[in-house]
């Protein structure tokens, strides 16, 4: 409905642009030009996207090369090491969970509704059960999916849960599949965190951001020094676009993260001017912005005073 952007009133996935399934872009060490053309023909800045894709493919190819070199050197020991690293992460997570008091811990957060069709806040409910050395996250009671683009695809819900577990369990635990093995997730089909097709999902990050907030709220009683209060709970961005250099048919598209800051804990202030939870992105420096986008001039860019929650430790600005 809104080319190149997300329509706030999209009521179907088919209104949000072309759908591209998982397809090969390279095969037998050769680029598949038709697939690249499909991607580039659907963007206003094909040169930028081609550069991005080429860089990602090159990085992956180097990664493949390094793994092959390591395997030729170490053989089956390398694979055994990889398996042990996954098992180690699982043991570490389960060891932490085993120290927690068994029980059920619940919390409800809310995401803003969408326009006149959904004026009321939508609940995201989670009940977390600690049983022995495993965790179960149950989203029963969460709002039903809606005909608006903030539904969260189930893989994103899983990612939000696993992010939250990793954040609470310790930053020295290797991030891999082992963390996930200690976690069970229940998300009823048709709710806003496990929608069915063709529910729109273009702005899902604004709802997905609330999932860690709900989880941290539920687990705060047993992680008092680690869990943080809610941040701005959204992915706030600015998109500017326009004509490029005079005398050319080029265009520019500038997408900037305008972060709202993170929540505080009982032992430290919240971070200011950064995205947290599911985005963790930083802003683009003004100098780099003005050099790359010559039609953009920043007059002022600063933190707004007194926008963090007050307290002994304040929220981020």
Locations of the language-model features?
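Glycine/proline-enriched, intrinsically flexible loops and inter-domain linkers
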Residues: 1-317
């Amino acid at each position: 409905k809104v080319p190149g952007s997300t329509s706030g009133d999209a009521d179907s996935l088919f209104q949000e642009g072309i759908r591209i399934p998982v397809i090969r872009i390279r095969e037998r060490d050769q680029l598949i030009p038709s697939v690249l053309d499909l991607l580039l023909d659907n963007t206003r800045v094909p040169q930028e996207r081609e550069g991005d894709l080429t860089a990602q493919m090159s990085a992956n190819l180097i990664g493949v090369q390094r793994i092959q070199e390591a395997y030729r050197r170490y053989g089956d020991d390398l694979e055994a090491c990889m398996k042990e690293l996954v098992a180690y992460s699982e043991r570490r997570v389960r060891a932490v969970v085993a120290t927690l008091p068994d029980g059920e811990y619940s919390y409800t957060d809310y995401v803003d509704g969408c326009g006149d069709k959904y004026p009321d806040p939508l609940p995201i409910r989670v009940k977390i059960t600690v049983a022995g050395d495993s965790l179960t996250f149950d989203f029963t009671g969460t709002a039903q999916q809606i005909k608006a683009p903030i539904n969260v695809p189930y893989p994103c819900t899983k990612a939000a849960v696993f992010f939250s577990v990793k954040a609470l369990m310790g930053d020295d635990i290797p991030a891999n599949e082992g963390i996930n093995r200690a976690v069970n997730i229940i998300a009823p089909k048709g709710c806003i965190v496990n929608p069915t097709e063709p529910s729109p999902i273009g702005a899902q990050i604004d709802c997905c951001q609330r999932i860690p907030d709900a989880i941290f709220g539920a687990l705060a009683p047993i992680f008092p020094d680690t869990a943080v209060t809610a941040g701005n709970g959204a992915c706030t961005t600015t998109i500017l676009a326009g004509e490029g250099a005079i005398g050319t048919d080029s265009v520019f598209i500038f997408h900037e993260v305008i972060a709202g800051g993170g929540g505080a804990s009982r032992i430290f202030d919240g971070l200011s001017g950064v995205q947290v939870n599911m985005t963790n992105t930083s802003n683009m420096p003004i100098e780099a912005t003005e050099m790359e986008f010559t039609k953009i001039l920043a007059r002022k860019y600063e933190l707004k005073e007194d926008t963090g929650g007050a307290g002994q430790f304040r929220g981020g600005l």
